[in-house]
């Protein structure tokens, strides 16, 4: 019988195999769309994953920083460094953490704090949402964000998170996008417990409109 971890790895392996063999072909990649649900920490094994680096990147996002690419590239391991080299220098612009903490007109809207406040006041709220996508600012971003919407739901005392991505590099990006999502669930669970709500971590559902594997990265996947 497969344990939960093995089951997640098996399902992801099967989905990637189907993506490569049955997905739409493009001169540079194969692509499709999918949704995957995790009830335990998602270590997907499509690349080497550093929990410490995932924590550092999530901290960087939650801090609202977007000044340098160095923090984001700290997560890169040597075998996939070439995948991110086009974005390894220069500034990121107003993406990810900037949108999370300094969004809206004049950068005065803290979406993360707004979600925390809503959940603390009413854990069953259906309005615990933040986004990293502002169309009018995409042109100022070094690269547009891939995960774009985060939605928290508390059902039956369990803190769940839905992440929607416009685009997902299955080999390079998915392992960290899902692991950091799982960390967010635990951070929100701890926050709600601190404020007197009795909740436990629930599930992470990651949905992407365009899951893709770049042809030059197939050797990393194999």
Where do the PLM segments sit?
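Terminal, non-catalytic protein-protein interaction segments that mediate quaternary/complex assembly
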Residues: 1-222
